[in-house]
């Protein structure tokens, strides 16, 4: 038990970047919390607003874009989400080089893109105004907002960034409900979208005024590609990639899943709002705990729990059970979203490099969010049901949780020693996977083997190379067997 406490202490204290003694992290105070709240306002207007695209898609398919398929219209939202994260590759380094003022121009463009969307009538217009301009301007705002909060906090970083990211959950509750009510009222499309634009104008104005960089701008190379030579950083981003391939599946498909099991359209619509409301608390509570036990301990824990809950989704077919799933999934997946930026920020060697590290991490996330939904859509079209979608999403998140555990061991054990411990952990997984039992038992209890492999590495390390390969591939093999049998 003492070794667990020691590892948590090492992770949370040793590895976050050290500020110079003359510039200690405030870890609180009016200015620091104002920045966290201001950044939360930015996420409310960007990430939170993007969560409302499902409402737009339902409206477009019966109104302006009725001649286009749902798959065609979905590209508007996919491109918007891709640029929301991908533009961080530019926004993060700009924050490190020029400070908080870099957020002003994209903040104006966010409002401009919403107002232009209200005037659109053709597909290419929606694609340009909402998909490309909206996504890019939001992404250029998002990365500096996250980076500004990270500059003010070290010991309380996960909690502070959880507060910031909770702004997106609040937006994910308010914007879909507001749009749903206004679009189908006497207001019509144009004024419904403009009212949303005015809401964003008010919140974004407060947010921009609240955000300040703590440290002076630092002249440096735009990207720090040498960061990808750090095993710790690469392991973290690999884990984040797999987590983001699967994490958004229920946000895209849960209403459709509910309707396919007899849920009314009205109740199914509110499932996303329920998820986002639960996610609000999921981005706060795990962040507070992460500051006590370490962000990687918390990230791997909530990732594995989220994956297990997603496997349980297979058996949830009644209205009550689907709503329970929505609440549980929203909370624990919110923990993943809330802790991820703190874990990435901890990889930076200096506080003035945090923006660049977060920006490069967001670029990796953008690829995952771009390919995840189409894979799920292809599985749904191929098999005509949700089983393969559920298994795929749960499996990649379980794998991401395992990798997050490996990144944690690398972070506080040193690169060589950490990799040896990770080998033992995966060998432990292989040992349990190969010892019989049903396939679902392998998937459900594989996470237990990670801990067993860490605690009993020498026992499980016989024929380690063979077992390592088996351990990494075992879970995916069982998933593929499901697909083969279903086909």
Curated annotation (Swiss-Prot):
Chief localization: membrane
GO molecular function: transmembrane transporter activity
Upregulation: Expression is positively regulated by the aspyridones cluster specific transcription regulator apdR.
A GO cellular component annotation in the UniProt record: plasma membrane
Membrane-spanning segments: 35-55, 75-95, 99-119, 126-146, 159-179, 191-211, 234-254, 262-282, 293-313, 322-342, 354-374, 385-405
Region (Disordered): 1-25
Glycosylation sites: 67, 319
Keyword NAD: no
Protein name: Aspyridones efflux protein apdF
Source species: Emericella nidulans (strain FGSC A4 / ATCC 38163 / CBS 112.46 / NRRL 194 / M139) (Aspergillus nidulans)
């Amino acid at each position: 038990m003492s070794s667990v406490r020691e590892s948590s202490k090492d992770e949370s204290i040793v590895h976050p970047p050290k500020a110079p003694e003359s510039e200690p992290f405030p870890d609180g105070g009016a200015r620091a919390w104002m920045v966290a709240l201001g950044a939360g306002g930015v996420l409310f207007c960007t990430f939170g607003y993007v969560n409302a695209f499902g409402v737009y898609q339902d409206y477009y398919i019966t109104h302006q874009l009725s001649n286009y398929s749902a798959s065609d219209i979905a590209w508007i939202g996919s491109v918007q989400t891709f640029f929301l994260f991908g533009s961080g590759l530019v926004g993060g380094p700009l924050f490190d080089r020029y400070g908080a003022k870099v957020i002003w121009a994209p903040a104006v463009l966010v409002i401009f893109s919403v107002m232009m969307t209200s005037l659109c009538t053709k597909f290419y217009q929606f694609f340009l105004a909402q998909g490309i301009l909206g996504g890019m301007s939001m992404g250029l705002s998002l990365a500096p907002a996250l980076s500004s909060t990270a500059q003010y906090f070290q010991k309380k970083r996960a909690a502070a960034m959880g507060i910031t990211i909770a702004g997106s959950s609040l937006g994910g509750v308010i914007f879909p409900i507001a749009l749903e009510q206004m679009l189908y009222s006497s207001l019509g499309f144009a004024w419904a979208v403009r009212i949303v634009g005015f809401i964003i104008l008010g919140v974004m104005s407060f947010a921009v005024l609240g955000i300040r960089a703590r440290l002076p701008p630092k002249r440096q190379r735009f990207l720090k590609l040498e960061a990808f030579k750090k095993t710790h950083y690469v392991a973290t981003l690999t884990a984040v990639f797999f987590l983001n391939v699967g994490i958004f599946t229920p946000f895209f498909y849960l209403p459709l899943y509910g309707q396919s099991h007899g849920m009314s359209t009205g109740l199914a619509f509110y499932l996303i709002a329920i998820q986002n409301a639960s996610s609000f608390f999921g981005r706060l509570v795990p962040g507070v705990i992460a500051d006590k036990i370490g962000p990687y301990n918390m990230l791997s824990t909530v990732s594995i729990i989220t994956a297990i809950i997603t496997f349980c989704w297979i058996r949830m077919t009644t209205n009550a059970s689907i709503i329970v799933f929505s609440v549980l999934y929203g909370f624990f997946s919110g923990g993943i979203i809330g802790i991820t930026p703190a874990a990435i920020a901890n990889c930076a060697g200096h506080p003035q490099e945090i923006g660049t590290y977060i920006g490069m991490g967001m670029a990796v996330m953008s690829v995952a969010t771009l390919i995840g939904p189409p894979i799920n859509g292809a599985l749904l079209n191929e098999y005509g049901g949700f089983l393969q979608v559920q298994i795929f999403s749960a499996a990649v998140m379980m794998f991401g949780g395992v990798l997050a555990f490996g990144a944690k061991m690398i972070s506080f054990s040193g690169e060589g020693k950490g990799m040896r411990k990770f080998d033992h952990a995966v060998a432990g997984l292989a040992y349990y996977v190969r010892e019989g039992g049903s396939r679902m038992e392998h998937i459900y209890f594989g996470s237990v083997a990670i801990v067993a492999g860490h605690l009993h590495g020498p026992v499980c390390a016989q024929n380690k190379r063979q077992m390592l390969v088996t351990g990494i591939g075992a879970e995916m093999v069982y998933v593929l067997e499901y697909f083969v049998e279903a086909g």
